[in-house]
Amino acid sequence: MLLFTAVISVPMLLLAVSVLMSVIYDSMFKPMNHGMPFHRSFAYPAMIVVFLISLLLLAFLFSKSIHSLLHKINLLNQTIRHLASDQRVPDKIEVKRADEIGELIKSVNLLIERTTYRELELRQQEEIKKELLQKLRHDINTPLTALRLQLFYLEDQCHGQAVFESLYQQIEYISELTNEFNLYSAETLESSYIVNEEVRLNELLETAVKKWDYLYSMSGIELHYKPADQDVIWMSNTLWMERLFDNIFQNTLRHSKAKKMEVTIEHGDVFIRDDGIGFDRNESSEGLGLKIIEDTCRLLAITYELHTNDNGTGFLFSKE
């Protein structure tokens, strides 16, 4: 619309100035100049001067309009960029004129309102989820405390310290998992918050083997552990690595039908092998366990290799 007005205004201005000057000359100055034609009189150059002055004034007005239009476009551009960034939601823009730019500003304001609503809704959902996780953590820890007390009294009456030690370790592990509820989301591993720390592989795997040794012996599986000659330290997260290896121990116990499992630390890498029947990666139960292993390794920046066939399954874990 602005471009059309600018194009049509120049000839219209020339026509208006020429007609006005001609009328003024004919009515006031032509009798004084003895009927001299307009184009030969002094009024003609005066008309040119008036036209040029009017043209400059018109150009100034259009430049102001274009500057105002560019200012609105830049304001819209900055607002949309702020809306797309991780910063706070921008304030709505004031609509000053009911033109095309005004309609566009109304649309952007509607988008800002929608984004603000969604942000508040997500924040409220996040608070509700945190509250539910805290309640769940409390509800889990309450029976765990009672279970510890009951085991304490049973320990004096029964023999078999290995059984009680394994149960205590499992209870402590569940308790540590509940303490992590405030560090990561319950929905995806990608949204988890990981604190890297020094993890001593010899100690971690020795603890894991002791924890699972009783259950493996009850299932007729020999569990052998060969630590490294020297301490091997990875920058990772102890609890998440426990979850990683516990998942492997659990899957082997449930599905492998193995007679022997070996856990070895060699050249800074972790090797876990069994002599079971292997598994099909596309099968739902094993596939879910493998997905957990893949996601956890990606989360901890651990490289792993998997080999499985009818003669058993082998895992290789390494970290740069």
Curated annotation (Swiss-Prot):
Membrane topology: Multi-pass membrane protein
Main location: membrane
UniProt-annotated location(s): Cell membrane
Any GO CC annotation of this UniProt entry: plasma membrane
EC number annotated for this UniProt entry: 2.7.13.3
Transmembrane segment boundaries: 1-21, 42-62
Residue span(s) of domain HAMP: 67-120
Extracellular-facing ranges: 22-41
Post-translational modification Phosphohistidine, affected residues: H138
Keywords assigned by UniProt, alphabetized: ATP-binding, Cell membrane, Kinase, Membrane, Nucleotide-binding, Phosphoprotein, Transferase, Transmembrane, Transmembrane helix, Two-component regulatory system
Listed SMART domains: HAMP, HisKA
GO molecular function: ATP binding; phosphorelay sensor kinase activity
Pfam families in the cross-refs: HAMP, HisKA
Gene3D superfamilies per the UniProt record, alphabetical: 1.10.287.130, 6.10.340.10, Histidine kinase-like ATPase, C-terminal domain
Summary of the function given for this chain in its UniProt record: Member of the two-component regulatory system YbdK/YbdJ. Probably activates YbdJ by phosphorylation.
PANTHER family: SENSOR HISTIDINE KINASE CPXA, SENSOR HISTIDINE KINASE YBDK
Protein name: Sensor histidine kinase YbdK
Natural source organism: Bacillus subtilis (strain 168)
